[in-house]
UniProtKB/Swiss-Prot annotation:
Keyword Oxidoreductase: yes
Family, per entry: Belongs to the glutamyl-tRNA reductase family.
Protein name: Glutamyl-tRNA reductase
UniProt-annotated binding residues for NADP(+): 186-191
Binding site for substrate: 48-51, 106, 111-113, 117
Record's catalysed reaction(s): (S)-4-amino-5-oxopentanoate + tRNA(Glu) + NADP(+) = L-glutamyl-tRNA(Glu) + NADPH + H(+)
Gene Ontology terms for molecular function: glutamyl-tRNA reductase activity; NADP binding
Amino acid sequence: MNLAVIGINYNNTPIDIREKVSFSKSQKYKACTYLIKKGISEIIIVSTCNRSEIYICSDEIDSHINEVVNFYKIFFNVESVNEYIFIKKDKEAVSHIYNVSAGLDSMILGEDQILGQVKEALRYSMENKFSRKVLNKLFREAITSAKKIKSELKISETPISMVYIAIKLLEKNIGTLKGKKACIIGAGDMGRLALKHLINEELEEIFVANRTYNNVIDLLKEFPKIKLIDYEKKYEILDNVDILITATAAPHLIIKKEQLQNIKQELYIMDLALPRDVEKSAGDIENIHLYDVDDFKNISDSNKIKREELSLIAKDSIDSYVNEFNQWMKSLKVDNTIKDLNNRCRDIKDEYLGYITKKIDLNERDKEILEKMLFGALKKVVKEPILNLKELKDEDEINKYIKSVNELFKF
C-alpha cells in the first residue's frame, strides 16, 4: 500500500480556480464513490476555502494518481486545473497532512479552523466507509500531533482564524465597530464564529439570515440579542447596515452587483465563502468595499515572522511523528506478508490433514492433536524468515524481500 495527496491550495492557485474545484457534500460523495469504483482502496477529501485535496491509499499508486488528476479536470470541467495541481507521495504526503492539521500550511499560519476541518473530513470518510485502516490511522495521528504541537509551541495562543483576520481588517478600515450595524448571512461554523467575534465589539444591531431557519433559531438561543431576518428578504436589510459578512455553503452567488447598485451608505462586505457568495464586480461600486478570502492574507503577515519561526521549531516534532507513521507503514507491509505465510501454512495443514484422515480413521482427540502438530511444524519452518522480516529497517530491503517471498510462494 502507498499513499498520495493530489490537489490544489492557496499557495499557487488563485481563488477563481479554487472556488471551481471546491467540493460540496454531495460532490464529495460522488467523487469518493467514483474513485473507489476505479480501484482506489481508501479516500479522504479535505476541501476548505484554501485547499481542495484528495488523499488516497492504493496498491497501484502511480496509475491512481493519474486517475485523480484526470478526475479533477473532468469532474469540475476546469481545463486549466492541471496547471495548479500538486502531487505528494508516501512520506511527503504524510508530512503534508501533519503540517496542514497543525495550521503550518495555512494562509493564516497556525489558524485554528483547519484542525476541525481535518477532523470532519476523517469523520465523513469513516462514516461512509471511504477510508479504512491506513488513512484512518494517518488522520488520527495527524490530529493528535497537531494538538500536541499547538499546545507545546503555543502556536495558537491567540486564537487566529479567517474570521478573526476579517474582523481586524474591518477595524483597520472603519475604526471602532462600536455602534455599527452588521448582517451575517450563513449560520454554519464560519457564520457562528463571525457572530461570536462581533458580539464582543458592542455593535448596535446584528442581523442574521440563513436559508435553513432552524439553524438560526439555535443561534438565537445562544445569542438572544441578534435579530433574525428572512433569508429571502436579505437585500432589504442591506440599506440599513455598515457591514455584511457572508459565509454560506451555496454553490452559486447569493449577492449580485445589480442588487447593490442603490446602496447609499458605505458598505463593507466580507465574503468568507468558497465558492464566493458575492459577485466580484460588486466591488467596483464606489461605496461598496468587498473583500474575499485572498484579501485576508496581507493582514496576517504581521504575525508571519514569529509564526514561521515556530513552524521551524515544530518541524523537528513533525519529522519525528512522520517517521513513526512511516515505520508503522513498513511494519504493515511486513505484516501482510507474514499473514500470507501463515495462511499458506494453514492451507497446507488443511490439505494434508484431509488427506491423512481419509487414509486413517482417527477419533476427534487424535485428529485435534495431529492438526496442532502439523500446523506447529509448518509454522516452525517459516518462523525464522518471519523474525528476520520483522527486524528489517531499510525500506528498500523490506520491499526487496517481500517481493522475493511473494514470488517464491506465488502470493
